[in-house]
Amino acid sequence: MSKTFIIEAVMLAVHGQLMLPGQPVTYIIPYTSIQELYELQAGSEPIMLEEEDDGFVKQMIGELITFFEESFNKKKIEKALVAPWRKSPPLPINENVTLMVVLAIDTEAYGEHFDPIETELILSSMKEQAPILTDQFDLIERLIQAEIPVQAFDVEDFEFAVEGDNQV
């Protein structure tokens, strides 16, 4: 059975290990985080501290954008965009990784403490009963402080999250 995580699209470009899990995983990605890829690719601000890493991550972002824009994948994603909280059909990446895009709606329920994409991650996690996978330790801290009823894993604990019985 596939393990499900809620993530931002950029995580797939920054953390290559997410594309090579030891067992099947499904990543549910809010559509707005796919839109954010275009901003990150076009922006002059570095994503990574090291120039070489930054160039590589921007190349990976370009590959992700190309993947999402492929005709077949684009049609699947468009199916999710017809109604709030609708998910796309599965977009297989490899034998162990499948993506699904969700049209998450930021209801501003957590707007005081979280930005719109973070809010979409939270609401998607609640709706799907799946943990958030992030590299933002401060997000995990804020989730705990605000007592948000979701499970979240740091990307450094990815293997533990995949192997364990950690479903919410």
Task: Annotate each language-model stretch with its function.
Residues 4-128, 137-145, 151-152, 156-162:
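Active-site-proximal, substrate-binding regions of enzyme catalytic domains
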Residues 132-133:
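Conserved SAM-binding loop
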Residues 163-168:
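A charged, well-structured terminal subsegment
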